[in-house]
Amino acid sequence: MENENKPNVANFEAAVAVKDYEKACSELLLILSQLDSNFGGIQEIEFEYPVQLQDLEQEKIVYFCTRMATAITTLFSDPVLEISDLGVQRFLVYQRWLALIFASSPFVNADHILQTYNREPNRKNSLEIHLDSSKSSLIKFCILYLPESNVNLNLDVMWNISPELCASLCFALQSPRFIGTSTAFNKRATILQWFPRHLDQLKNLNNIPSAISHDVYMHCSYDTSVNKHDVKRALNHVIRRHIESEYGWKDRYVAHIGYRNNKPVMVVLLEHFHSAHSIYRTHSTSMIAAREHFYLIGLGSPSVDQAGQEVFDEFHLVAGDNMKQKLEFIRSVCESNGAAIFYMPSIGMDMTTIFASNTRLAPIQAIALGHPATTHSDFIEYVIVEDDYVGSEACFSETLLRLPKDALPYVPSALAPEKVDYLLRENPEVVNIGIASTTMKLNPYFLEALKAIRDRAKVKVHFHFALGQSNGITHPYVERFIKSYLGDSATAHPHSPYHQYLRILHNCDMMVNPFPFGNTNGIIDMVTLGLVGVCKTGAEVHEHIDEGLFKRLGLPEWLIANTVDEYVERAVRLAENHQERLELRRYIIENNGLNTLFTGDPRPMGQVFLEKLNAFLKEN
């Protein structure tokens, strides 16, 4: 009995075979839900595989994906299959895992299934699918129109037929954590230009997969267009209308300022905030220092550990079984304490912060750049940022509170090695180039640049991708993408524990940083290992942060590129000139540049918030 509700591939296949489609869909959703919980891993999903694959993890994953894709093909090719309005929402929340099942199998996409929906035998273009007029066909089309699809889609036509279904598909297509291939990347880029003005027409979130709203909000940052964050403004408007109409939301009356221990109150809403997470390492010191002027109340999830909780004068778990209850809890804390400041060190990784950013909870509301981008919210006045991380203020809807560059000193990672045996190779036959990157930061432009580096360098190079989030069924797809540009000149290492990840980079001679979304922790890891590399700067903070860090570390400015051509040229120079590269590495090692990131004066944030509060009180 205990295995009955466990995800099981054979159970799914059996239900498909006997055309018990209700059971088949339930079994499929169970498998997709488990993949979601596992971040793509296939553990806890029961399926038999040939014993020959026992120790071949990647081949086992491809085998799993191929079996799943074959059964899904049979299921969705049958015209008898009907998916309800509720069913399509459930499938679209998990569409990214359907996409990976096909992308990591030989099928690549589900276009062969979409072709069975075509009702126009005399079409001129096989990539044009002419559906019948039933809603059922449109629903099935939306579920299987995946990021890798080559089929033509007219969003205007779909919007005219069903705005909510079209919006739901746009949500799903922006939700994957890897949108790196030119097909997938261009699809998202098109949506980011088309979608904002249409999304803004929706009255509420009721008939769209709002559970993946934070993916829409956050993943737009990995695009390359200047207006890529506009989708946030539209999403914010829909969220605001939703909480007013569906929750009966009323903003807090913020004229009353309360005091605890004779200090005004700052309420801090947290996302990922524990001692092993980068947000804790980058933003805890400034909050501790702010307690000189404010009584700090932290609000977060059970993942906030003891170290995270101790940053605050008091800490509360956010109570509530749903978003309405969570928002009401946050408002009650702000109300009962007369919060003067409502502050979020990061926003975009969790639904609660995004919803809260569309409410008025305190007279002064601010974020920091734990996820480095604007909110486009009508309710956030300020962004806390170190001065040297700013590229262009025009990237923000908020007013920037620009702090000195040492005002947010980092806390060293608890996992950082105590001692490093530096690997300094004098004249390597092959220059190993390390790339620390999550899957979200990979894109065709970055890979084209790496290909140009390989082709132009007079020395042989090999790229080692130390990948974050490339787990389970994600990895074969990511690896194929990397190999499609770099072939045997690259090794794609799947997501690995921190020490193993450092070992991959330790064996490299230099590094290059991804763009347009650069690195913070990757640069810290680079310098920890006595490595140097090249970065590309730009207008957005998530581009410019690399430049700021390189300059703080005392690296020469020629390693900071303004254009892709400069990036390629400088990476080639660093790869070819062994002596110059080793001198730079020795400089970094001997001067312990990393120490500059861990030292500084964390007091300015609290001071500038106090100034803003005093100005507010004077005016009111």
UniProtKB/Swiss-Prot annotation:
Note how many cofactor molecules are bound and how.
Answer: Does not require a metal cofactor.
Q: Does the keyword Transferase apply?
A: yes
Q: Under which EC number(s) is this enzyme classified? A: 2.4.1.-
Q: Which UniProt keywords apply?
A: Cytoplasm, Glycosyltransferase, Transferase
The family annotation for this protein states: Belongs to the glycosyltransferase 41 family.
Function summary = Inverting glycosyltransferase that catalyzes the transfer of one glucose moiety from UDP-glucose to an asparagine residue in peptides and proteins containing the NX(S/T) motif, resulting in their modification with a beta-linked 1,N-glucose. Likely acts as a key component of a general protein glycosylation system. Also accepts UDP-galactose as a substrate donor, albeit with low efficiency. Cannot use UDP-GlcNAc or UDP-GalNAc as substrate donor.
The name of this protein is UDP-glucose:protein N-beta-glucosyltransferase
Organism equals: Actinobacillus pleuropneumoniae serotype 7 (strain AP76)
Biological classification of the source? Bacteria, Pseudomonadati, Pseudomonadota, Gammaproteobacteria, Pasteurellales
